[in-house]
């Protein structure tokens, strides 16, 4: 039963996403609403992204640096950290953070509007709910997800470099040379793959959260249930998509 509901929800989300993309191509975008959503998914989520990026870079660096230093190849620390972060940890952790911060807000906002009949009122005014409510949220996530991902990668690398220099005596120039041109180094292909993942994840987060919000029925209790369901389904879908994209991009 759970699997049936999962695929039913996923199909419904894809339909809503398709409708939103159709409105986007037709140029039916409210700039004011888009700006509001950009503020929520951008600056509103920036602090948790930066803090987690610093923590992830430091922890990853501790694990890698301790092993490489004992093997006498500490000059490769920067490259391994950069590649590991760009290919996997930055897009996936950023998506997880955005799910917790933004998807919950989308599902709760639209769910509340649904149970208080505000969406029906929008429809009666001959305004398409998907155009008015989903399009700005989808666009904001597609725009801000790669930006947040790049910021996450940047602070992770800087925290890793500082930790390597202080505790493992790796000169900054050695660390950054490894990032750019070591045996394992960060390439444009890695960055492209990271941005592709972040855009796809942002798209999934927005359409799934909006679908749960728009289909909420009942009262305040059901709004909470929809919000929880949106987070769970988003995390599962993003994880599965990450496996698929990793195989396509690096397999």
Region locations from a protein language model:
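Selective transmembrane-helix segments that form parts of the transport pathway or gating/packing helices
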Residues: 42, 46, 50, 89, ...
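Hydrophobic alpha-helical transmembrane segments of integral membrane proteins
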Residues: 131-139, 228-251
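Short cytoplasmic-facing helical segments at TM-TM junctions of multi-pass membrane proteins
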Residues: 110-135, 220-223
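Generic alpha-helical transmembrane segments of integral inner-membrane proteins
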Residues: 50-55, 142, 146, 150, ...
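Short, membrane-interfacial amphipathic segments enriched in basic
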Residues: 1-32, 212-213
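Hydrophobic alpha-helical transmembrane segments of multi-pass membrane transport proteins
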Residues: 77-120, 148, 208
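Membrane-interfacial helix-loop-helix connectors in multipass membrane proteins
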Residues: 63-86, 154-199, 207-226, 248-251
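Active-site cofactor/substrate anionic-group-binding motifs, chiefly glycine-
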Residues: 41-93, 97
């Amino acid at each position: 039963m759970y699997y049936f509901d999962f695929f039913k929800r996923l199909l419904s989300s894809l339909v809503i996403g398709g409708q939103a993309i159709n409105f986007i191509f037709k140029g039916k975008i409210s700039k004011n609403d888009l700006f509001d959503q950009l503020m929520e998914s951008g600056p509103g989520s920036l602090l948790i992204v930066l803090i987690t990026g610093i923590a992830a870079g430091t922890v990853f660096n501790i694990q890698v640096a301790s092993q490489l230093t004992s093997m006498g190849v500490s000059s490769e620390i920067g490259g391994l950290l950069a590649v590991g972060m760009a290919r996997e940890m930055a897009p996936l952790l950023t998506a997880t953070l955005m799910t917790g911060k933004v998807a919950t807000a989308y599902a709760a906002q639209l769910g509340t509007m649904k149970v208080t009949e505000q969406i029906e009122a929008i429809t009666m005014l001959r305004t398409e709910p998907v155009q008015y409510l989903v399009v700005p949220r989808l666009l904001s996530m597609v725009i801000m997800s790669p930006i947040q991902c790049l910021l996450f990668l940047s602070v992770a690398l800087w925290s890793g470099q500082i930790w390597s220099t202080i505790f493992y005596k790796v000169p900054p120039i050695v660390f950054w040379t490894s990032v750019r041109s070591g045996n394992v180094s960060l390439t444009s292909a890695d960055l492209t793959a990271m941005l592709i993942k972040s855009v796809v994840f942002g798209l999934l987060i927005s359409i799934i959260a909006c679908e749960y919000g728009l289909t909420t029925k009942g009262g305040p209790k059901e709004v909470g249930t929809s919000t929880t369901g949106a987070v769970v389904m988003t995390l599962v879908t993003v994880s599965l998509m990450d496996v698929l994209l990793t195989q396509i991009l690096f397999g």
